[in-house]
Curated annotation (Swiss-Prot):
Protein name: Decanoyl-[acyl-carrier protein] acetylenase
Cofactor: Fe(2+)
Function: Desaturase/acetylenase likely involved in the biosynthesis of a polyyne metabolite. Efficiently catalyzes two sequential oxygen-dependent dehydrogenation reactions, the conversion of decanoic acid loaded onto the acyl carrier protein TtuC (decanoyl-TtuC) to 9-decenoyl-TtuC and the conversion of 9-decenoyl-TtuC to the alkyne-bearing product 9-decynoyl-TtuC. Shows stringent substrate specificity toward C(10) fatty acyl substrates.
Chain location of the short sequence motif Histidine box-3 per the record: 286-290
One CC-aspect GO term: membrane
Gene: ttuB
Highest taxon listed in the record's lineage: Bacteria
Residue interval(s) of motif Histidine box-2: 135-139
GO terms of biological process kind: fatty acid metabolic process
GO function term, MF aspect, one: oxidoreductase activity, acting on paired donors, with oxidation of a pair of donors resulting in the reduction of molecular oxygen to two molecules of water
Length: 339
């Protein structure tokens, strides 16, 4: 493992500020909008094209898959491919992109580190550097005009504006990806860009994304020995899976910043949304998360389902994860709202 990789993961293990965003992210709100977002027409146009493809193509795949299922039924293999690829890519997002790369809540071996990165890129939510930069920006400017996907306010035009319920949910779920306010990744991801292999994997986003579509198609074709099996594997394990993974992630910025309980003082509108916990692998405990961004565990009650945490816990027991950041009762009580 390279020294660059070791330095990128370096983080203090004593006196942990579990209320910060990341041990490596900017800690103060940037004051100039031009510094937070890019004013590059070429980058903005490219981002819009990618965003529209990310939204529309999986939706078309879902429609095609449902039509074929109506005509011919759906096989157990297709269901297995959907579930299996959903598990791998959503773990890549929630365990990898989110808790490991964005917030550095645990450490792991280089092989696991980069494998989670690859699985995350197969999900179809952008390269790891773009995703982490956008997420750290969201935490630093949560539910303000500089938050990229707040359902309460936005800065997509000349001036910031407050959003009503319908516009807010639409903006936070999908609309934020197709405006001109592209996050300045260099401001938020110095730790990632210092590692050459991370940069190389990030630059291979589209080949890795396509690989995530080819794998279920190949499995479907080989197991059934038919082109139809390859097609349905591509649809259910590829595009349909991508549709559900991306929309589950987007729920965290839209519904989980509008609906749910708010036991902690966070200074924003983040809420704990029970109904989204399973598809998001625990990310929808947004109020918990915004209160303690550096905690590896988001589900703080026994009934708060947190699938990504269960995997981190198992990895720790197997010796595959260490320096796992945990909350103390004092951390929790200090942030709890006074009734």
């Amino acid at each position: 493992m390279s020294n660059t990789f070791d330095n990128a993961l370096a983080q203090p293990q004593t006196g942990m500020d579990l209320e910060g965003v990341s041990t490596v992210a900017p800690r103060k709100k940037s004051r100039k909008n031009a510094r937070v977002t890019l004013n590059d027409p070429g980058v903005q146009a490219t981002q819009k094209v990618i965003a529209y493809l990310t939204i529309i193509v999986p939706l078309l795949g879902l429609v095609a898959a449902l039509y074929l299922a109506y005509q011919n039924g759906i096989s157990q293999l297709d269901i297995a491919l959907l579930v299996g690829m959903y598990l791998l890519t959503n773990l890549g997002i929630e365990m990898g992109y989110h808790r490991l790369f964005a917030h550095r809540t645990f450490k792991t071996f280089g092989f696991v580190h980069y494998l989670l990165m690859v699985f995350g890129q197969m999900a179809g939510e952008g390269g790891v550097i773009y995703w982490v930069a956008t997420h750290r920006r969201h935490h630093i400017h949560s539910d303000t005009a500089l938050d990229p996907h707040s359902p309460h306010t936005c800065h997509t035009g000349a001036e910031p504006e407050e959003l009503n319920l319908r516009r807010g949910l639409l903006h936070a779920h999908l609309g934020w990806m197709v405006n001109d306010k592209v996050t300045n990744s260099a401001l938020f991801t110095e730790d990632l860009t210092r590692d050459p292999l991370t940069k190389a994997i990030n630059d291979l986003y589209f080949p890795i994304l396509i690989l995530g579509l080819i794998i279920p198609a190949a499995i479907g074709g080989i197991v059934t020995n038919s082109w139809y099996g390859a097609l349905t594997g591509f649809l259910w394990g590829g595009l349909v899976r991508m549709f559900f993974v991306t929309h589950s992630t987007w729920l965290n910025g839209s519904f989980a910043h509008r609906y749910g309980s708010k036991p902690f003082e966070t200074g924003d509108h983040s809420a704990n949304n029970f109904w989204c916990a399973i598809p998001t692998f625990g990310a929808s405990w947004q109020n918990n998360h915004h209160a303690f961004p550096l905690s590896a565990m988001l589900g703080l009650k026994w009934w708060q389902i947190d699938i990504a945490w269960y995997f981190i816990w198992v990895f720790e027991k197997l010796g595959l994860a260490w320096s796992v950041r945990r909350l103390t009762p004092e951390h929790i009580e200090r942030k709890r709202k006074v009734a």
